[in-house]
């Protein structure tokens, strides 16, 4: 049972790395259009309101974590199938 445990550990590390990378992704600094309170057209003052929208990186973290965990499950199943096929071939 050594290889499946290694796959599980590697999978967990992969999921954690993806979650950390997705959380750190995205631009730094001020959001677009808020540089000094002026927009890019004519230099007019831009009034912004908080509409409760999440930033794209923050919204995508659950998606990336879910996709990574699904990938880990698929890899684990493929490893199990390959082990069974190899064991059946040697029997």
UniProtKB/Swiss-Prot annotation:
Q: Which residues cross the membrane?
A: 56-76
Q: Does the keyword Kinase apply?
A: no
Predominant location: virion
The superkingdom of the source organism is Viruses
Provide the membrane-side ranges marked Virion surface in the record.
24-55
Topology Intravirion: residue spans: 77-91
Keyword annotations? Disulfide bond, Host Golgi apparatus, Host membrane, Membrane, Signal, Transmembrane, Transmembrane helix, Viral envelope protein, Virion
Q: Where in the cell is it found?
A: Virion membrane; Host membrane; Host Golgi apparatus, Host trans-Golgi network
Which parts of this chain are annotated as the region Disordered? 23-48
Gene Ontology terms, cellular component aspect? host cell Golgi apparatus; host cell membrane; membrane; viral envelope; virion membrane
Q: Which InterPro entries match?
A: Herpes_UL49A, HSV_GN
Q: How does it sit in the membrane?
A: Single-pass type I membrane protein
Q: Using the record, list the residue span of the signal peptide; answer none if the entry has no such feature.
A: 1-23
Keyword match Signal? yes
Under the heading HAMAP family, the entry gives: HSV_GN
Which family does the record assign?
Belongs to the herpesviridae glycoprotein N family.
Assembly behavior: Interacts (via N-terminus) with gM (via N-terminus). The gM-gN heterodimer forms the gCII complex.
- Give the protein's function: Envelope glycoprotein necessary for proper maturation of gM and modulation of its membrane fusion activity. Also plays a critical role in virion morphogenesis.
UniProt-recorded name of the protein: Envelope glycoprotein N
């Amino acid at each position: 049972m050594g290889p499946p445990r290694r796959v599980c550990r590697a999978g967990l590390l992969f999921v954690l790395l993806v979650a950390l990378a997705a959380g750190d992704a995205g631009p730094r600094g001020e959001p677009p259009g808020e540089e000094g309170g002026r927009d890019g057209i004519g230099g007019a003052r831009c009034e912004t309101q908080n509409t409760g929208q999440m930033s794209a990186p923050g919204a995508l973290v659950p998606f990336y974590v879910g996709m990574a965990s699904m990938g880990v499950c698929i890899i684990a199943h493929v490893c199990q199938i390959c082990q069974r096929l190899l064991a059946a071939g040697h029997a």
